[in-house]
Every structure is written in structure tokens, then in C-alpha cells.
Amino acid sequence: MKENDNDNRFINNVNIDYELLHYSSTLFYIHVTEVWIMKKKRWHIMPRDTEKENTLIRELGVNPIVARLMVNRNIDSDEGHRFLEGTLKDLLDPFTLKDMETAVALILETIEAKKSIVVYGDYDVDGITATSLLYRFLVKMGARVSYYIPERQSEGYGLNLEALEHIISDGASLVITVDCGISSYDIVEAVCDRIDIIITDHHTAPPQIPPARAVINHKQPDCPYTDKNLSGVGVAFKLCQALWLRQCGEWYLDDLDIVALGTVADVVPLVGENRIIVQAGLKKMNELPNLGIDKLIDVAGLHDKTITAGHIGFTLAPRLNAAGRVTHATRAVELLVTDDVDLAETIAQELQETNMERQEIERSIHEEARANVATQGHLADYVTVVAGENWHPGVIGIVASRLVEEFYKPTLVISIDDGVGKGSCRSIEGFNIYNALKSCEDILIQFGGHAAAAGFSIDASRIDELRHRLTEYCKVQVSPDEYIPVVSIDATLPVDDIDVDIVDRVSALEPYGMGNSTPIFGVMDAKVQDIMLMGQLKNHCKVILSTANGSVDAIAWNRPDLFRYIFQGMNVKVAFTLQKNEWQGFVSPQLMIQDIEPIIEEPIQLSAEGLREIYTIVRLALKGGANSLYHVEQEILRRKPTNQNGSSALMALDVFKELGIISEETNDSGQAMIRWNVINGKLDLTTSVTFITYSQQEVIQ
């Protein structure tokens, strides 16, 4: 093709079936701009109760914005004192837990007799920390103790008979479970005449409690313990407290950083005892942490940060979890129990590398699963069901969560191995995924879980049937509104009021977690001073908002799509959480974007003439080869005709991809690239779904 032929490159055939277009436009709109439409959210601004707010201001002396946040969390004046000022002295008596006396007596008797004890744990962070805590404590008590954690893929969660038989044959006298065991009635019954078992667990108790020597679980019937929110490591900590109190006459307060790590990671409500434990544990983590945790902080690049619950949940816990997902969780336990600096450094680095491996496996499966949704025609399904051969079963739950974030539909991700699919499910607010699976139990091999997350296995030949059954189930059980995620806004703020002082005042509510969620604020009208992609892969977005005194940065992780419809000079509304940004000694407020929308959305309209102009820009940017998607998008926005808005100009890339002019690929670093393809002859624009959809807006609206 000659250089000057590009003006005549496109043919615009207008013989369009408008009725079909009207029917299809919604589906194609989802296909072409899937990230955009799936990110649309409903804002719910929580109503105020100024009378309650004023009571808190008067009786607790808190800032008005803090009072409003406390009212939103149903915290009154009495509870407010404990919430804001609770200390370790307020922890409950561990002996009020049912069977604690029996457990303490049996453990002390076993230690005195120098008999062997095995701590039987679990491979998630709650189980890892509970195992580490109790093992360290029993060593301190002079016990002969070892630990056992089942392998995720071959053994699965909880007690298994084969493992217990090995433990018995090795001569153990007592098994103490942590974070598991409450549902293992048959297994405990099979071995309880040959070995003593103490169960410590926090999961919901079934009707039949296992016949162990002692069962410590605050959720079992007739347990008078008033705090029902402890994690698995929290229950193990209460056992340590009781033993130390009986032996030494004082509270056991060591290893609180380990307890905090598991408590945050298990996403239990951070209220009551959990809040006190996590506050104290974070203090220790920042002042004199466990050696293994300290080395984990180093490899995670957090050594110069004040560690928060957020750092635990999003940075430290995933590195410990990676061991159980990709290799074996015992390595994570070794990190937390060692006193050898060199060994701790070695294991921490191993976990860092294992986590990177987990991320790569997850990224690969996520990309394949995401592509399956689009290419197999399931974008408009009521439920997302994707399957792949030999997907790593240790990460499919994470992939399911990511797909829920993108498409906001109940999601099942299935790994097929030797004709059998092992699935992991994640749900949306208000939809019970466990009940959905139960409606299909006749075609499942097995299943289990709860309302928000579940797992199952199925013959691979029945996956399509499962998709159909769940689709029909969701048609009845899920309303259209439930497919739109809701952002609950605690309070609205003028953008000019956002400063470091308000961040400091709001931090009185930390640590955040389930039951005390991170406050979300809303700015209803702010002007975009600038927008840019950031990160090595250009997969994060920074939006700079104008303020009366300058500007404030707003960050959106994993939202490169914002670059396509938020532009300089726009007025936007933003839902966000607040945090400090500390850089080279300078401290400033920073908004973490939860949602952002233009006040006035720019209509997307495409024309053959406009595409010809963008075609020239793209061709020059690629120079017959390849370049980063970010660079090409920047060139389009910089050089586009003034009569085209940014959204329409960037949408041209989707048209070009559908016509085969360009293709998208990923380089060795994982960065999105655009490659120029040599195409001979004329191109028919009506073969582009995107062009048909957006060149006929007036017809289909």
C-alpha cells in the first residue's frame, strides 16, 4: 500500500440489520469494553445520624468525621471507649472456654511425663501461624513437640486418617489440632482409643462434636466464651494463655505479632479481642518482630514502612500462603519458628521467589480464563464458569476472585486433570454460592464451602451441564441490580478538605478489617489536572486532582482502563480510601481509588473519516513494527483531531484489532504491546463489531 492511500483504506457499508444491532449492542458493548461496563458501580452514601454523632463527640471527645465513621459502624459511647482505648488487660479469661481446664491438665501431664506431642495444623496463613505459635510455646514449656501440616493437593484440609496412623506409629502420645478438626468426627473416633487428641478450632461446629479428650472452640454448643470471632491462631493463643497462667500465674503476651499475622490473614472481624490482639501485634511487628517476620518484611520491601493490617493482608500473608499453594506450608512454619538468622533470610527469600512463581502461574491462568470467557461466548452469561487442563489447583481460587472483580458475577474456575475437574467458587454480595452448588449436587462428585466461597469436584464431561444448570438457577435467584456492585460511602468530602490531618484523625479507627472496614469517602466533583499510567507494566493509574492549594494524587491499582475514559480537564466524582504517601521525607495525603466516574460522560462515536486519521497516527507510532500499548495510546491522545474526544479516539484501536490491522501481545516483561500487521486490499468496516456499535449510536439508543 502506498503512503497516500490510507485515506481510502476503509469501506463503510451501511447495509446493517438495525434490529439485530439493537439486540446485540449490549452484548458487544460488554465484549468490546468489558472492563468499563463491569467496573460500573452503584454508590450508596450512608445516611447520617447527627444525634448519635454529637453524643460521641461530647462523651468521647472525638473529631466529627471520626464520630460519623463510628456511628456507621454501630459503635456507641460505651463500646467506643473499649474500641478506642482497649488494652491487653481487657482480654477475656481463657478458662471460660469450654474444655480448657481439661486441655491444660492433659498437656501439662504429657509434658511432665516427657511424652511426645504433635501440633497438627493447616496450610493457610491462619493454620501456619497457629502451628508456629503453639510449637514455639510448647518448646518454651519444655515439651517434646513436633508439628505436621497436610499437603494441600494430595491430602487436603483437616485431619486425615493416614497421617494420624503415621503419627501414632512414630510414638506420639498427644495430637493438638489448630485451625482444624471440629468436623472430623469419624477420623477422631477411629483413633481416639490409641492416641489422645485435643481439638482447637474456630470453624462452625457440626451437630456431632468429635470424641476428643478436649474440644476448644468458642462456636461449639454450651461454650460460655463471649467473643465468638477468634481465628484459629486466636484460639491457639488462648490455649497458650491458659497454660502460662496455670504455670506462671501471669498473662502470656509473647508472639503477638504471629497471632496478629494469622488473625488479619484469616479475615475474621477485627473487633473485640481480635482488635486488641492485632493492635498489640502490629506494635510488636514494628518494634521488635519475630525473626522470620522481620526477614519477610525485608524481602517484601517494607523495612522502611510502618506495618499495618493492610500490609499483612496484601503483602506478608500472600508470601506465606504461597508456600502452601505452590510448594509446602511447612517451609513457612520453619521461617516463623527459627532463631537462625541465616536460615530465616534463606527461607524468606525462598518464599519471595515462590510468591513470584505463584503470581506468574496465577497471571497465566487468569489470562487464559479471561480469554475463554470472551472467545467462548460467555460474556453475557449469568454466571462465569471457566475450565482448563491442569490449571494449578492452588491458585484457581485467587483467579476466581479476580474474575469476580472484573465481571462481578458468581464465578467458578475449574482445573481439569485426568477427566476430573476440581473447582473453586467465589460469589457476589447477596448470592449464596454454596446453595447454588447444592442445587446441582446430583452432578457433582463432592462439594463444600459457604455463602461467599466454595469448592467442588465434577466429571469434566458435565461442566457444560453445570454451567447451564447454574445459569438457570441464577436467572431466578439473582436480580439485575445484584449484578451491579455497590460502593458504600461513609462520608463525602470536598477535595480541598483532604489533608494529612484528616488522615491522622481517621487512623484512630485502625486496624481495619472485617467488621471494621476501611472508611470509604466520596468527592462528588473534582477536576482532573493530569492522568498517567504507572508501574513497570503500565498497569496502574495515577489521577492528579486539582485542589485550592495545589493538587492531590489518587491511585488506582490494576486499572489501566481508566486511561481510556478519564482525561485531563474532566470533572469527576471519586470514591476512595485515605492513606499517607511518604516520599523522601515529604508526607502527603493519597487517595486510593475505589471508583471514579466522569460527571458528564463523553459519548463514543466512530466514523470512517475519524478512523482514517487515527490510522495514520497508529501507523507512524508503530513504524511497521511493535510498540507498547501505553506509548500508542499516548500518541493518539497527543495527536488526535480536536473534534474527536479521547474515548472515541482510543476506541479506534479495538476496531483496528478486529480488522487485523494490529494485534496485541505481551513482551517478556509482561508489558502489553501493539504490533503492526501488513494487510493488503480494502477493509470492510462492517466486519468490526465495535465500528457497527459506535457508528450508529443514534439508531440503537
Residue ranges and their predicted role:
Residues 133, 210-264:
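Short alpha-helices
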Residues 139, 144, 275-318, 322-370, ...:
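Acidic, two-metal ion nucleic-acid-processing modules in DNA metabolism proteins
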Residues 4-6, 13, 18, 31:
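Acidic/polar hotspots within intrinsically disordered regions
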Residues 171, 178-230:
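Histidine/acidic-residue-rich, glycine-tolerant segments that coordinate divalent metal ions
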Residues 167, 190-191, 656:
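Generic structural signal for hydrophobic
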Residues 109, 204-217, 375, 545-550:
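Acidic-glycine-rich active-site phosphate/pyrophosphate-binding loop
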Residues 22-37:
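Short, Lys/Arg-enriched N-terminal segments with co-localized hydrophobic residues
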Residues 37-39, 46-174, 194, 244-463, ...:
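Hydrophobic helix-and-loop "lid/oligomerization" segment in the mid-to-C-terminal part
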